[in-house]
């Protein structure tokens, strides 16, 4: 299955040109042989983040939406809340896997509030905003993304 993956970077301080983490994710997606369906940068605003997730899922028909940033403890970090507001079902194992993998790199990973949910047939995964942490999050789950994206679309389990 060829995946279409959208990137939504959540930041008050970056634009598309300065979005190093998003650019790194684009490279990783393409290296996997998948398609970048869209890539936007929005402010750390729950409404804007939610709208961008909805557009990526519903208009761009992304199988997966990766948000980047807004997952920490700052009062401006609202990506998990924005994700929850526009999605239907929790997929806790993916966020748990990212945290577990990231804990082998830095103990600060325990401070992440990142979540993973479904919006219809689209998987929405929160990644941290730093380039290093976004790459590590990708490493943690990339080998399972295709299967995870097939499941909501009616794909069966494989061993």
Residue ranges and their predicted role:
Residues 1-159:
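Non-catalytic beta/alpha edge segments that cap or flank active sites
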């Amino acid at each position: 299955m060829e995946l279409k993956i959208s990137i939504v970077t959540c930041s008050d301080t970056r634009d598309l040109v300065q979005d190093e983490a998003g650019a790194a994710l684009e490279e990783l997606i393409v290296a996997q042989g998948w398609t970048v369906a869209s890539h936007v940068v929005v402010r750390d605003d729950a409404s804007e983040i939610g709208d961008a997730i909805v557009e990526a899922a519903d208009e761009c028909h992304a199988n997966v939406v990766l948000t980047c940033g807004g997952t920490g403890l700052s009062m401006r970090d609202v990506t998990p809340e924005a994700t929850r507001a526009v999605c239907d079902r929790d997929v806790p194992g993916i966020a748990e896997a990212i945290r577990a993998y990231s804990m082998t790199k830095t103990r600060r990973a325990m401070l992440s509030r990142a979540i993973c949910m479904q919006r219809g047939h689209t998987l929405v995964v929160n990644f941290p905003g730093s380039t290093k942490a976004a790459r590590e999050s990708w490493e943690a789950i990339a080998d399972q993304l295709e299967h995870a994206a097939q499941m909501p679309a009616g794909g069966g389990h494989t061993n």
